[in-house]
Regions:
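Active-site-adjacent loops and short helices of periplasmic peptidoglycan-processing enzymes
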Residues: 22-169, 173-182
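Domain-terminus/edge residues, biased toward the C-terminal soluble/receptor-binding domains
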Residues: 148-152, 160-165, 169-384
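Sec-dependent N-terminal signal peptides of Gram-positive bacterial secreted proteins and lipoproteins
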Residues: 2-24
Length: 384
């Protein structure tokens, strides 16, 4: 049985009718060659400018380096490693590794993401994979897994040649994956810290300048220009912003993030535990069985977007039913496109009747007679 209802009017009681009405916000003009603003929870793209064009990405590459390393290490950064000569002396920004010194993987990891050490990138690659080329292969495989279809890596630090690139949309996908990894998310959100006598300061000024900023990564080369991936959270909503080749990246990120939070607020379509349907219940003293959403479903909605929900439940159900067991599904659509779904579970348990209803009728008739039944006669009448 499928029932299509107006999600906002019937289920969420947010506003009457079928259409969400909020104050309109106008998308800002940005100077970036490419830009993307993405909702972190759902992956919805809220703003895009030349989002699929492959471009040089400079040190934002290190988000993939960090993700692959964190996944390989299982988040354990406690191990101590001896710095090898071939890991040192890398051009550009540096952690200034010294051959023969011993450092923790945590120092290398945070040295990669905060001061953007190119030598730290090489060190992590070699510790994890044995050599840089193998690690870069892992990076490209992970990009493929994430659906980064306009991306190719040739090194772990972003110093690469014309064969090292990504699109703004792909970098937003990468940023979303990084936020879902606790080890990476914690590191990119760190403003500064001291590890093993090294003072590490994050290059991402938005951590100080933008309320709710949760970090990510800066980058710059002459070929790439200024590149930036940022994230921010407000009122339970996380946004990811990417700009490539943007001379005004700090201002553009602030404007895009403000726009996203204003124009696409996170809207709860169904709360976990909210009743979304009822069906006839057979074989029980109860007449109906209620089904509720197992998880909360939310989506960033813009002014004027129409929301509906399709509830799939059986036409009827036979007792017993058990609270929490799957009863059906609910699918949420925005302008006809599915944007979320959740299982429906039974809201409460209902046992099967232990007495036959016909037996109850027979017992009632007997009780109307001249002689009251014995206890044994009553039990016999009530047997199903």
């Amino acid at each position: 049985m499928r029932k299509q209802l107006a999600a906002l009017g019937v289920l969420c009681a947010l506003l009457p009718g079928l259409v969400l009405h909020t104050q309109a916000a106008e998308a800002p003009a940005v100077s970036a060659a490419s830009a993307v603003l993405m909702d972190g929870e759902t992956g919805r793209v809220l703003y895009a400018k030349d989002e699929n064009t492959p471009r040089a990405i400079a040190s934002t590459t290190k988000l993939m380096t960090a993700l692959v390393a964190a996944e390989y290490l299982g988040g354990d950064l406690s191990r101590q490693v001896e710095i090898q000569r071939e890991w040192t002396g890398i051009e550009g920004t540096s952690l200034y590794l010294v051959p023969g010194e011993t450092l923790s993987l945590k120092t290398l990891f945070y040295g990669l993401l905060l001061p953007s050490g190119n030598d730290a990138a090489v060190a992590l690659a070699c510790v994890c994979a044995g050599d840089v080329d193998t690690f870069v292969g892992w990076m490209n495989q992970r990009a493929q897994d994430l659906g980064m279809t306009h991306t190719h890596f040739s090194d772990p630090n972003g110093l690469g040649d014309e064969n090292h690139y990504a699109s703004a949309l792909d970098m937003a996908k990468l940023g979303r994956a990084c936020l879902q990894n606790p080890t990476v998310a914690e590191a990119v959100a760190t403003k500064s810290l001291t590890l093993e006598d090294r003072q590490l300061v994050n290059h991402n000024k938005l951590l100080w300048q933008y309320e709710g900023c949760t970090g990510m990564k800066t980058g710059y080369t002459r070929q790439a220009g200024r590149t930036l991936v940022s994230s921010a959270e407000r009122a339970g909503q996380t946004l990811i912003c990417v700009t490539l080749n943007d001379r005004n990246d700090w201002a553009d990120h602030k404007a895009l993030l403000d726009y996203g939070f204003s124009a696409y607020p996170r809207t709860v379509l169904a709360q976990a535990g909210e009743e979304l349907g009822r069906v006839p219940l057979e074989g029980s003293l109860l007449h109906m069985a209620a089904a509720e959403a197992r998880e909360t479903v939310a989506y960033p909605l813009q002014e004027g977007e129409r929301v509906t929900v399709q509830v799939d439940l059986p036409d009827a159900v036979q007792a017993p039913v058990v609270q929490g067991e799957i009863a059906g599904t609910a699918r949420f659509l925005v302008n006809g496109q599915v944007v979320g779904e959740t299982y429906l579970v039974w809201s409460s348990s209902a046992n099967r009747d232990v007495v036959d209803r016909k037996g109850l009728g027979d017992l009632w008739d007997f009780l109307q007679g001249e002689e009251a039944p014995t206890f044994a006669q009553a039990l016999e009448l009530l047997e199903p």
